[in-house]
Amino acid sequence: MAITNNVGSLKIQITNNNFFPIEGASVYISPTGMPDSTSEEFVTDENGIVIDEELPAPDVAYSLEPGENQPYSEYNVLVNAPGYNERFISGVQIFSGENGIQNIELTPSDGSDTNPTVLDAHTLWEQYPPKIAEDMIKPVNPSGGIVLSRVVIPETIVVHDGAPTDPTARDYYVPYKDYIKNVACNEIYSTWPDAAIRANVLAIQSFTLNRVYTEWYRGKGYDFTVTSNTAFDQKWVYNATIFENVSQIVDEMFANYLSKPNVTQPLFTQYCDGRRVSCPGWMTQWGSKSLADDGLTAIQILRYYYGDTIYINTSETISGIPSSYPGYELTIGSSGDKVSQLQRQLARISLNYPAIGTVTVDGLYGQNTADAVRKFQQIFNLPATGVTDYKTWYKISQIYVGVTKIAENV
C-alpha cells in the first residue's frame, strides 16, 4: 500500500471471542486530545476489517533521530456492533509512511459499561525504568534451575503486566509471535532500516527464549514467563498497535535466536536506548539504527555489541503446530501430503472467514488453492503472493490452531 508523506494507514481487524470476524461493526477514529474534532466513521467488511489510509502523522524524520518532537500521532478508536459490548482504545500510534494494524476483540453484550483501554507511550519517547543488569548466560543449575534440554518455541507466553512482585497485575496468555511483534513495536520504531529492525527482533526473541528455556520466573515461584516491566523484561502493551513491516519480519524469523559456541541456552541479549541510558556490553537501540544506516547487516550489528562469536540459531521445535514447514515453498504445481494438510487447515479457517472461499482437499496445489492462500495472506497481513512460504505456512497453522481450539471449548 503506497502512503504519501506525513500520513499513515491503520487497518482495524475486529473479531468476537470465538475468532469470527464481525461484519457491519461501526468504527470511529479521531485524534486524541482533540474533543471537538470530527470522528471518521467506517463499517467493517465480511472479514471484520476497515482501513483508513489517510491519518495525519508527524514527519518521518522525527523517528529517525532522538529529539523533542513526538514522532507519531495518537488516535482514539471506538467500536460498536449489535450484540457486543462497546470497545474504546486510546493512544493508537500512527507513524508517517507506515501501515498500522489494530486487532480488537469484542465480547457479547452483558450490560457493563465501556472500559477504555489506554495504550502506553512508546519506550523511545516516554521514560521507563532502565533494565536491571543480568548475566547473558545463566547458571546451568541454580537451585534446580534449567530443566529444558533443548530450545523450544513456545505456543504461548504468559505475560505478567507489572513488576514480578505485584500481585495485583494481570497475567495475559499471548501467542509467542504476537508477543514478539508487540514488544518490537513498543521498543523500536517501524520506520527504521530493515537491518536494524531484524537485529532488534533477534535480540528480543533471544531475550524471551532465554526466559522460557531457563524457566526464570517459575524457578522463583511465579506462574508466568515474563513481565511487562522494563526494569526486569521488555515493554509489552496490552492491545498495542502492530506495524505491518515488523509483523512480517517476525513471521519470517520467529524461530531464530542468538547463540554462542558450546552454549545451549539462547543468549539473554539485553539492550537499552543508548541516549538516555547507557549500557556497556549491550546493544543500544539508537546505535543499531545508526549502524544499519552505515550499511551493516543484522548479524554484523549484533556482533558489534555482543561479540564476534555470536551466531543466529534456529529452533527445530515449535510447540502447538500440527505439522512443520516442508522446507520449500508450496505453489501451483506442488502436490502431496503437505498440500493436503494446508488445504485442510484453510478449509477449516474458511468456516470463520468465508472470503477465503471453498477449498478442495485433493493434495494438488492448483489455482483454487493459490487463490485461497492469497486471500488468507490479505486478511492476515502477509504479502499476497498466493505462494505458501515459511511465514505463510506457520501463520496458517497459528490461525488454524486458534479457530479449532476455540471451537473445541465452545
Predicted regions and their residues:
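Conserved, single-site charged/polar hotspot
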Residues: 1-3, 24-28, 43, 47-56, ...
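Structural motif
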Residues: 5-23, 32-34
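Short beta-strand and strand-turn-strand segments in soluble, beta-rich domains
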Residues: 30-39, 86
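Short, solvent-exposed loop/turn segments that connect beta-strands within catalytic domains
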Residues: 33-36, 68-70, 352-355
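Short glycine/proline/serine/threonine-rich loop/turn segments at secondary-structure transition edges
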Residues: 59-73
